[in-house]
């Protein structure tokens, strides 16, 4: 089922699961939406970037600088596996988690995947003064966001069960209410989930 931009798009139909995964690009507002949804769904909220930072003892940008992106992605995959193995969690995923095929498969198997989609210009305004995003370094932030969107959109769509489009001026209460309405209709929460892949 499709709906107008600013509403939502259902991609994969019902996905029985006890877990909810938020995916989307940097600056989409996943952390904010996750914090809003978690108490209303009675789920613990786990932000994978914060988990990785706690385990590494340094911020994401320093992990990228000292260890490289490949090391960060390995940490990210391990954190995803660890925190989605048990049922009943809301996971806020980093923007690049979809770059690995194994992560995309695991997301599809272990939870209902909601893609928070926000335009690059809107995200560029939000991130203009944010120096913590290692893949956004450079002079042309908007161009970099558009480049990442072009590369990753197909992967977001591959593992998403539904898409929530955010409008430019929407506050978190309005966005959260739309997310809850979508989940109420299309998330068969409480059904059995699949086990770990062989």
Residue ranges of each PLM-predicted region?
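NTP-dependent small-molecule kinase module
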Residues: 8-15, 36, 40, 112, ...
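Hydrophobic anchor at the beta1->P-loop junction of P-loop NTPases
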Residues: 22
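Conserved lysine of the Walker
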Residues: 30
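Post-Walker A helix-loop "phosphate-sensing" segment adjacent to the P-loop in P-loop NTPases
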Residues: 39-48
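ATP-dependent small-molecule kinase phosphotransfer cores
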Residues: 47-108, 132-133, 146
């Amino acid at each position: 089922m499709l709906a107008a931009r600013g509403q939502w798009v259902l991609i994969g139909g019902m996905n029985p699961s006890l877990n909810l995964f938020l995916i989307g690009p940097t600056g989409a507002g996943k952390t904010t939406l996750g914090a809003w949804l978690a108490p209303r769904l009675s789920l613990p909220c786990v932000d994978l970037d914060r988990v990785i930072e706690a385990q590494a003892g340094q911020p994401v940008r320093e992990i990228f600088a000292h260890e490289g992106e490949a090391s960060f992605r390995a940490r990210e995959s391990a954190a995803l596996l660890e925190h989605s193995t048990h049922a009943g969690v809301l996971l806020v995923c980093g923007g690049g988690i979809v770059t690995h095929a194994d992560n995309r498969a695991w997301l599809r198997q272990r939870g209902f995947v909601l893609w928070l989609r926000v335009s690059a210009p809107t995200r560029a305004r939000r991130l203009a003064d944010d120096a913590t995003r290692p893949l956004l370094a450079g002079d042309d932030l908007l161009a970099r966001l558009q480049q990442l969107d072009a590369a990753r959109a197909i992967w977001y769509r591959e593992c998403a069960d539904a898409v929530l489009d955010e409008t430019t001026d929407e506050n978190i209460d309005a966005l959260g209410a739309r997310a809850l309405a979508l989940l109420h209709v299309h998330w068969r929460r409480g059904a059995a989930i699949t086990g770990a892949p062989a």
